[in-house]
Amino acid sequence: MESRASLSILALLLGFSQALSLDQHEHVDITSRILTINNVLLIGFILSLSLCVLLVEGSSELLLEGDILLPKGRNGLVCSDSSCFWKKSSDGLVEVPYTLSSVFSFTDRTVIASAMASFHSKTCVRFVPRTNQTSYLSIESKDGCYSNIGKTGGAQVVSLSRFGCVYYGIIEHELNHALGFYHEHTRSDRDKYVKINWENIDPTTQSNFNLKNTNNLNTLYDYSSVMHYGRTAFSINGLDTITPIPDPSVNIGQRKELSAIDILRINTLYKC
């Protein structure tokens, strides 16, 4: 029993090591990092149950498309009115209150603040420390990188696990979900721009590629969006699950930060 437990812990640590090393390779897009980290941490959560070891704060969540929390207060991911978006104040700024878990180190907090500042410098969105607001982001180190879509009301968790999620681009990705943005590959006109290779996707995960009835804000499909899946997301054989059309050589997925079109969409949605 002891030997089996030791092997399980070793496998877990190796998984963490592989997930964290992704940040060292610029060819790995942000969504691929998120999916890998979430898979590793899910395995860690399962092992922690069997070994009675608490590895991260919080519990395993049911995630859609790899990093989207299914909201409990509304029908699926459908947002039919402005209640899903954060309100603009009279000064023209959109304030998004947040709290930050005490488990984050000074370095973690610096990275999170830097990612938030990127929104401040390019949009009218302002992430502000919560005072007494009812609706706010509760940024915590749970078991993965994930968020709701848009404002759900009350305290809504944005998970940035300290075991791999506290990186500039990943934080931008999850905060952009919280502002109301879906993954780019699920937008309603997706099939004009990419081909989904269903034969390379496990049937149990094909729902991650379902189209959404999205408001595309009269913007172009953005292959370089921070919200775009990488080529092999949810692949069962290492082959591409997403192929750009008509030119399959086009780079897809963002490796660093919000794209110009990501910024345009935020400013358009919130009328900055």
Regions inferred by a protein language model and the residue ranges of each:
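Zinc-dependent metalloendopeptidases
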Residues: 2-272
